[in-house]
Each structure stands twice: as structure tokens, then as C-alpha cells.
């Protein structure tokens, strides 16, 4: 979307906002630097904290360093008594992605704390393609934003269409933007991590295993097997 706007194939954006979880892949940060070097549209980085370090402080169910509750990642669970598998509810996207962007939008509008935002004051674009239409929000997360999906309602582009567009324009294919230890990684995505990132994820996986007074063990791989032991060739 950013590059299509840069090329004039979509309306000109006022700004792009990247919400940094503090635990992104090195390739993601390199891509961000690259984009800043080639487009005139401002790219603003915001942050709601470091999701990995907050997790270390909270140990799954406790409090972060600032005394605030930690937002769960969607870890997989295995009950020690029954062996039943489950999954924790995801809260991290709202706390580390949606909320920091909302706060930045309020700053851009010049709003002070507790000042009511005008309804529909911001048009916010989200890069969801046609084949990911199931991810479209049923409603805007707040009254000040009108959410648009340019790849769906301004053009009709699938993820492969986006990749072909980048190739036609001579741009390198970007990495998938996700936390290093995101439980939604496929085996291919776990394999694509560089060595340092994978070892970091293994360390994190061991750290969360049986913390927080839960009845079960916690894992970041969907198999509920320690990441270090998973056969990622499947």
C-alpha cells in the first residue's frame, strides 16, 4: 500500500505508522530502513513496549515492570493431568499494535488526554488482501477512525498479486512482519528465522513453559512440543 501510494496508484498517504513490538525480525527492521530511504511519505515508528521483555517480567500471568497487567500472547497449552490441548486468548495485538497506533493518531490530531476525538476524523488504511478478507474488522476499533482496505475496496489484489506488483516494479520481496516468537508461525516461518532469532525463540519457549501457576505447560509451537525439539521439515 505504501509503495502503491508512492507511485500514485493509490491516493497519497499523509503518513505510515509502524508499531514496533520490540521483538521483530532483523529483516523487518532492515525493510523499514529501506522503505524510509526510497519514499517521501513519512514513516512513523510507535511502540507499546517490548513484548519479550514484558513477558519476562510478567512470567505469563503477573505484572509488567510498570505494574500493569501483561497482555497474553496466544500460547498453546497442554494440561498436565489430562493431556488436553488448548490455547490462551490473544491480547497482544491490541496492546502492542492497535493501541500505540491509536495514541499516535490522537497526537497527530492535536488531541489532549481525555479530549473526545471527532468521529471519522482519520481514514486508516489496513493492508489486508482479498484472500485474507476474513481478517477484516467488523467495525472500527474507535470512533475517530474510518477503516479502509485498499487492496480490497480500491483495487482487488491477492497476496500473490501484491508480490507480482513488487517484482514488476523491481522491489525486493518483504519478509512477513511478525514477532520472532509469534505462536502463529508456520514451520516454514520458524525455519526462515536466522540462527540468533531461532535461539532467542527457543530460550523464550523454555522461559514460559510452566510459569504463572497454570494447570498446564505453555508452548509457542502449535504441536505443544518444545520448539528446540520440533521437526520443522514437515
Sequence positions of predicted segments:
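Nucleotide-activated chemistry modules centered on ATP-dependent adenylation/adenylyltransferase
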Residues: 1-234
Amino acid at each position: 500500500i505504501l509503495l502503491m501510494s508512492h507511485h500514485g496508484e493509490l491516493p497519497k498517504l499523509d503518513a505510515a505508522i509502524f508499531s514496533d513490538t520490540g521483538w521483530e525480525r532483523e529483516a523487518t527492521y532492515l525493510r523499514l530502513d529501506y522503505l524510509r530511504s526510497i519514499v517521501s511519505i513519512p514513516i512513523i515508528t510507535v511502540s507499546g513496549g517490548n513484548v519479550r521483555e514484558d513477558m519476562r517480567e510478567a512470567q505469563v500471568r503477573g505484572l509488567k515492570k510498570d505494574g500493569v497487567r501483561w497482555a497474553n500472547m496466544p500460547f498453546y497449552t497442554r494440561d498436565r493431568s489430562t493431556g488436553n490441548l488448548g490455547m490462551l486468548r490473544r491480547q497482544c495485538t491490541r496492546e502492542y499494535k492497535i493501541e500505540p497506533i491509536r495514541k499516535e493518531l490522537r497526537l497527530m490530531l492535536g488531541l489532549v488526554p481525555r479530549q473526545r476525538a471527532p468521529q471519522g476524523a482519520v481514514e486508516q488504511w489496513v493492508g489486508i488482501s482479498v484472500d485474507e478478507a476474513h481478517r477484516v474488522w467488523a467495525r472500527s476499533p474507535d470512533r475517530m477512525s474510518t477503516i479502509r482496505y485498499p487492496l480490497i475496496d480500491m483495487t482487488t489484489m491477492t497476496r500473490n498479486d501484491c508480490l507480482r506488483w513488487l517484482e514488476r516494479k523491481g522491489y525486493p520481496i518483504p519478509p512477513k512482519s511478525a514477532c520472532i516468537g509469534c505462536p502463529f508461525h508456520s514451520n516454514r516461518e520458524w525455519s526462515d528465522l536466522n540462527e540468533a532469532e531461532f535461539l532467542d525463540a527457543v530460550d523464550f519457549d523454555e522461559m514460559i513453559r510452566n510459569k504463572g501457576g497454570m494447570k498446564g505447560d505453555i508452548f509457542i509451537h502449535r504441536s505443544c512440543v518444545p520448539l528446540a525439539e520440533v521437526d520443522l521439515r514437515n
